[in-house]
Amino acid sequence: KYGQEYTVNLKPNEVRILRVSDKEDTKAPKIDRIMTDGAKELTVKFDEKVSGNLFKVENAKISSIKKSADDTTYHIVLAEAPANEATVKVIPQDIKDMSGNKATEDASVVYHKNNVIVENEKVTEAGQLAEADKSLNSNNGFTVYATVNTAETNKSLIKQNDQYELKVTAEGKASFTLNGATAVSSKMINDGAEHKVVGVKENNGMLKLYVDGTLEGSAYNKDNRFHKVEKAAITAGEGVTAAAVYDIAYGYNEVANLGEQEGLPKLKLTNDMITVSET
């Protein structure tokens, strides 16, 4: 009770953290991010610290549930991988915040096998890569990849209408744009040689731009942390010879392997990839 004095007796090396407020917390915790690893694992992150360990996944059996040390994140492993493009609904059962408020709202994510939205290793002409119903539709991190050979300027490489875009700028550099934020490379890519251009939107809202495996630029917009990319057709521009979009934010090492014959190594989601800062 606020204003009341309490005495706490601690054992040697014991630590207790107390939260005190002059207002009662009656707000239920909510799932603010739900992701898949493209295989059998779901990652569910709440908007505050919670207790409990029971979930229901609609039309699926759960193999295991593990809570992370941050007390906000759960890793749910399913007995079998969902069908490609199936909607996976997660329903909290006994999840409560530190004030005892119970989580009641479910959350859903569209499952894509191996996190692939679209993947085309041999683009022969400019045009549509994926129709709107098969496009990215999420507030999670994602990765856009293109192999390009061009001498042009101010040309689109990969875009999902006005939702995001990889392009060649008027100066011949690479750029990656999402919701008002643009990362630009220092390196020119319109030299008639082949270049691998990758844009990554991380879960904290940071945009990163890689050219030929090297980080070339970044940009940040706090509103992009939970900015939702809406459905629209995905298209490739002139000079693009390979293209892909993934519903996961790949890290530096994974980006370096994009487009290689041996393909991407299996990526394991970690807390570092989903624990984000407000600033």
Please give the residue ranges for each predicted region.
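C-terminal beta-strand-rich structural cap/linker in extracellular carbohydrate-active enzymes
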Residues: 2-25
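Acidic, Ser/Thr/Gly/Pro-rich low-complexity segments and short DxT(G/T)-type signature motifs
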Residues: 23-33, 91-121
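Short, surface-exposed alpha-helix to beta-strand junction/turn motifs within ectodomains of secreted
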Residues: 37-67, 90-96, 107-110
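Surface-exposed, short loops/turns at beta-strand junctions within beta-sandwich domains
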Residues: 79-87
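Extracellular glycan-recognition modules
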Residues: 117-121, 125-175, 201, 206, ...
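Short, aromatic/His-centered strand-loop micro-motif at the edge of beta-sheets
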Residues: 175-196
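Short tryptophan-centered beta-strand motifs in secreted/extracellular beta-sheet-rich domains
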Residues: 193-202, 209
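Flexible glycan-contacting loops in extracellular carbohydrate-active proteins
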Residues: 215-241, 267
